[in-house]
Regions:
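A structural signal for short, hydrophobic/glycine-enriched beta-strand patches
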Residues: 1-166
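Glycine-rich flexible loop motifs, especially short His-Gly-Gly/GGXG/HXGH segments used as catalytic or interaction
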Residues: 157-184
Length: 184
């Protein structure tokens, strides 16, 4: 695949709209975790969403769950506890989506859900989008509102580290989702 094809395959960035909540995906990397949390908080503060759902248990059992750390960061900058939903068991993108869906169902929020803003790193947005579309009930609109820091569509080819991650993600996405992923 060419760099342009990889860019079109992976990088999804849409303008935020008013939504029922923002679903903020965790990250093992602390800098990515902070960037994603900041983006979720920005969407909350700007009035796009009335609540944040932070999701991620973390890969290492020895560390505090990603979602708990994100909730702490959000509270430190003024997001009230009442406006935070915390899903702290999952450790894969699929588990993030499944466990978040289940949490929303348990809280009685899934049935009325119309629009959800998705927050992750931009180069992971296609995977996130395909996963939530496959996991959540049909009819929910998902809008990709990634961080604009780190590896982005504008800069990923300039950094060898970003380039490695992005190429690996494109290969994994095509292997896992096949032709569905290739039709953005």
């Amino acid at each position: 695949m060419t760099d342009d094809q990889i860019t079109e395959l992976l990088f999804v960035r849409e303008e935020p709209v008013r939504a029922d909540l923002a679903m903020v995906f965790g990250a093992a990397n602390e800098a990515d975790l902070a960037r994603r949390t900041r983006q979720g908080v920005r969407l909350y503060r700007e009035g796009y969403v009335p609540r944040l759902l932070v999701t991620g248990g973390g890969v290492l059992a020895l560390t505090r769950p990603e979602a708990a750390r994100m909730a702490d960061l959000a509270r430190q900058v003024g997001v009230p506890v009442a406006d935070l939903l915390v899903e702290a068991r999952s450790n894969t993108t699929f588990a993030n989506a499944r466990d978040s869906r289940d949490l929303l169902r348990e809280r009685g929020l899934l049935e009325g859900l119309a629009t959800v803003l998705l927050v992750s790193s931009e180069w992971l947005m296609r995977r996130v989008l395909l996963t939530v579309q496959a996991t959540f009930p049909r009819g929910i609109r998902f809008v990709c509102c990634p961080t604009t820091e780190g590896c982005t569509r504008e800069n990923w080819t300039a950094s060898e580290a970003c380039r490695r991650e992005v190429i690996q993600e494109s290969e994994l996405l095509l292997a896992f989702h096949g032709p569905i992923a290739a039709r953005p």
